[in-house]
């Protein structure tokens, strides 16, 4: 799996603490190896975020992404549940 990042993701990622950035990096590495790993709790989003998916990076930290193809995705957002859904 190839992962690209959207500029919004890059800005949000830069604002995370060092510990949170490490969790995101670990989750992205796992996602590249196995996008359907149970630990990621990957699921499709609905409504305003239809076409996007969410994975868990631990605790309340979430990553949003869209599939570009069967082997490529773009990370579009990262943050807590409240930051992403409000």
Residue ranges and their predicted role:
Residues 8, 50, 80:
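Residues that form or immediately flank small-molecule/cofactor binding pockets and catalytic motifs
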Residues 2, 11, 22, 56-62, ...:
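Enriched for short, Lys/Arg-rich terminal
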Residues 1-28:
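Arg/Lys-rich, positively charged N-terminal/basic patches that mediate binding to nucleic acids
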Residues 7, 44-46, 59:
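A general secondary-structure junction signal
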Residues 25-27, 43-45, 66, 70:
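General helical structural elements
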Residues 30-55:
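A short, surface-exposed loop/turn module that caps and links secondary-structure elements
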């Amino acid at each position: 799996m190839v992962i690209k990042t959207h500029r919004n993701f890059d800005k949000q990622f830069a604002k995370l603490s060092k510990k949170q950035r490490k969790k995101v990096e670990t989750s992205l590495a796992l996602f590249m190896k196995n996008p359907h790993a149970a630990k990621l709790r990957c699921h499709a989003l609905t409504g305003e975020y239809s076409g996007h998916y969410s994975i868990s990076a631990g605790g309340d930290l979430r990553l949003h992404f869209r599939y570009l193809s069967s082997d490529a995705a773009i990370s579009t957002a990262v943050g807590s549940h409240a930051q992403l859904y409000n």
